[in-house]
Amino acid sequence: MLSRGNAALAAAFVLVLSACGTEDSGGSGGGATGGLEGTGAITLVTGKDTSGNLQNQVDGWNSAHPNEKVTVIELPEDADAQRQQMVQNATTKSDAYTVLNLDVIWTAEFAANQWIVELPEKDFPLDKLLPATVETGKYFKKLYAVPTTSDGGLLYYRKDLLDAVGAKPPTTWAEMYAACDKVVAANPGVSCYAGQFEKYEGLTVNFSEAVNSAGGDVVGDDGKANVNTDKAKAGLDFLVNGVKDGRIAAKARTFKEEEGRRAFQAGELVFHRQWPYQYAKANATDGSSQVAGKFAVAPLPGMDGPGSSTLGGHNFAVSSFAKNKKTAVEFIKYMVDEKQQRANLEKTSQAPTWAALYDEADLVQKFPYLTELKKSIEKAKKRPAVVKYQEVSSAIQEAAYSAMSGQTSSADALASLQTKLEQLTK
């Protein structure tokens, strides 16, 4: 599974040049060249593949295209570190990276800076994909990246433990914490709730979901910061008070996706906010999960009712400085195809972008969360659509982490964040 720091927010940043190709995938520097031409070896640059299936997909391509082989270059699990390395490669105009597996929030930034090329819409089955995911690959209505996986936050919960105390899946934060209190009292050593609370993109996602789920906005539709409000404070207080009263364990403040997944699979959590990829791993029957068959998923809870997820996912784009762009386009077509998306869903439980897969009876039976996930993606909120997204995200992380750590109050953290965001969104 690729790191998600996988998303209720979108991005806003940029265009293109291209390349005539030779037979090697390159590694030297050089400016952007020509059109979508050139066939030969290419690279796929991606975050750490914790799903274990990406190489299988690439192997399938390589077997059928021995003269156009794809080499996977894995970057760190941390999304911010991934972006940093991709940006460094782009700013040096290196041709070492061909196809970039971009978090949806980076598409606009890379397009605006002319680090990725515009792609021909007619070459891809965009009408078969979830419309919300297609929009994440566009910049000023032009296609720069193709969505291969989507994401929406889900609430994983221990169904067996809730059943034992007569609790139902919660729709509000109060219901979730009330159920926790009953379960934890009967199961010493089990913690109530965790998400992605380390200071990285995942915290931006979790903070934004909390604010949105309280009825607020981080950045409004007019592009203006909107965090110094009662609703935003209610969202942040949900996280801050959870830490204070122990319902969010202290160590959970260091969790990214994988740390939380391991804790949930070890039976340490009652509730876990996580992406769809966790489902297959947590339900594994090979002895790696202590909760297989004991959990279920539900929509994220909110302050007064069901909450709002952040729109996540990954898009494939082509570096402006790469060689063999024609091969890159053909490889993206292969990866976005229904056959590959179906196989990836069945192997990893990652959310597909191919809309029809969410309604197939056999898949819904195997992955009961698909119906709710589709609704989550369709209703998910984008991340702040601002040009300086990375700076905005860093400011959000600093404010949320400092409040959750008890270094500052929610009110002061949000007042300071409002000032910073106003400067960044001018």
Region locations from a protein language model:
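Hinge/lid segment of periplasmic solute-binding proteins
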Residues: 104-152, 203-206, 292-296, 362-366, ...
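Conserved C-terminal helix/tail region of periplasmic/extracytoplasmic solute-binding proteins
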Residues: 163-164, 185, 375-426
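Glycine-centered hinge/linker elements that transmit conformational signals in sensory
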Residues: 180-182, 186, 224-253, 300
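A structural signal for short loop-to-beta-strand junctions that line the ligand-binding cleft
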Residues: 88, 96-98, 126-161, 191, ...
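Long, aromatic- and glycine/proline-rich binding clefts that accommodate carbohydrate-like moieties
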Residues: 132, 136-137, 295-298, 345-395
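Extracytoplasmic/periplasmic solute-binding protein
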Residues: 144-148, 153, 174-226, 240, ...
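Extracytoplasmic/periplasmic substrate-recognition and gating elements
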Residues: 63, 165, 237, 241-247, ...
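Conserved N-terminal structural module of periplasmic/extracytoplasmic solute-binding proteins
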Residues: 2-16, 20-108, 123, 286-289, ...
